[in-house]
Amino acid sequence: TPEAYNQAFAAFIRRTQPGGAVIACAEDAGVRALLANEDFSWIQVLTYGYSEGCAYRIQSIRWNGEGYDFSLFHTDTQKEIGSFRLSVPGRHNLLNAAGAVAVLYQMGLPAAKARASLADFSGTERRFESVCHSADTVVINDYGHHPTQLNLTLEAARELYPDHCLWAVWEPHTYSRTDAMQEAFTVALQRADRVVILPTYAARETAETDTPFQIAKNIPGARAACFDGFAEAADFVAGQAKGLNVVIVFSAGKGPQFASLLCEKLDERRQND
């Protein structure tokens, strides 16, 4: 439940030693609620984000074609820590970068170290990972299996590929998670132009539900479809992906296998065109 989820984070923060510090994202509603409703008075709670009240405030944000140039301002000293370049898209990645810089600064490490590390950072495996691309279609693997992750990744894709048709290929991860977050998944997937829902990755679960079909049905515009197998779904996407397309495969299970199959199907289509 959301309550249990929040309490798990509260318990984690309570493990901080007296006099220690927690660096928290002020742009996350869950974080804000947690800090407002729990007593962490024995530690320093330092926030980062875009807001005026943040201890570490992101400023001078500029899209650089791959990611963002930005600066970070330290409110307590009224000084700019430095300017930084991030070469991966997504405002969530920008926030993560700012949080990392804040931790280093809090530890007394020079901004130059953070600047060099961020400039070289190209992302992590299965996080907005390009699998194959051609002149018109890009296939991306992403480990997203929570509505918030889907939202942020689709937002980043829109920013990076504004002229492409955006596909969300989603492999639901466990029946229980899909049932519990049905409404949130439905809303998140609507950020895409086309939605393909793969068979649920059940993991340890056996009690099947029809929730993925209900999610597809509730996405307006008849732009979502469910499939019983990878081959059928890959054939569908390869046949429908005309013009400029970016296809993001969201999965914490067998998504990489589907992405590889789709790349093969797209290559076959190009050879036959």
Regions from the PLM with identified roles:
Residues 1-138, 216-223:
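Acidic, Mg2+-coordinating active-site environments of NTP-dependent enzymes
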Residues 21-26, 167-171, 191-202:
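Short internal beta-strands
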Residues 28-29, 145, 172-175, 200-203, ...:
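Short glycine-rich anion-binding loops that position phosphate/pyrophosphate groups of nucleotides
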Residues 141-150, 172-180:
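Active-site glycine- and acidic-residue-rich loops that bind
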Residues 154-161:
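Surface-exposed amphipathic alpha-helices with a cationic face
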Residues 186-245:
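C-terminal helical cap/extension that packs against the catalytic core
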Residues 200, 265-273:
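Short, flexible loop segments at boundaries between secondary-structure elements
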Residues 233-265:
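A glycine-rich beta-strand to alpha-helix segment
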